[in-house]
Design a protein with these regions (language model features):
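Rossmann-like AdoMet
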Residues: 1-89, 93-137, 142-143, 147-153
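Short SAM/SAH-binding signature in class I
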Residues: 153-159
Length: 159
């Protein structure tokens, strides 16, 4: 398998590998709180020295609990059907695979927002989907919010 070499230069952006590794480790546990096959696949696809993070067992459990909680919130948001246009926006998405984990994902539009170098890597790793879109930018800018409002004038948003 040809591995993908990340071109992440920013130290903050590089932290995206920690929760990815946590999700992959958790998924391999027999009594896993969160199963994330996509995380396992991504760790195998990326040419990166994950060993530099050492043992991350303490943060693995916390990450799994937090992600399972947010996955359930997203699932309920979509299931409530309070709008014909539910929109889920993941700010600072990194390499999170919530779209793949949430079973009713095709009933909503997902947007993954992160720094350009992170989104560039994400677009190489994740399968393209008309329901899981990316936004290159900073959460501190507001132009992406205006774009979402234009695209989804009757949308109900979950950030």
């Amino acid at each position: 398998m040809n591995k993908i070499k990340p071109e992440i230069k920013d130290n903050i952006a590089e932290t995206l590998f920690i929760p990815l590794l946590s999700r992959a480790h958790e998924s391999h546990r027999k009594d896993a709180i969160l199963k994330d096959p996509m995380a396992c696949e991504l760790v195998e696809k990326i040419d990166y020295d994950f060993a530099k993070f050492g043992k991350i067992t303490m943060s693995t459990t916390g990450t799994a609990i937090r992600l399972r909680h947010f996955d359930r919130l997203v699932q309920r948001f979509i299931d409530r059907k309070v709008t014909e246009d539910p929109v889920v926006v993941s700010i600072g998405c990194g390499l999170d695979s919530r779209f793949q984990r949430v079973s009713n994902h095709n009933q909503a539009t997902f947007y993954e927002l992160d720094l350009p170098e992170v989104i560039n890597l994400r677009e190489k790793l994740f399968p393209a989907s008309a329901k899981d879109l990316t936004i290159k930018g900073s959460m501190l800018e507001t132009d992406w919010m205006d774009m979402l409002r234009q695209k989804h004038p009757h949308g109900r948003f979950l950030f």
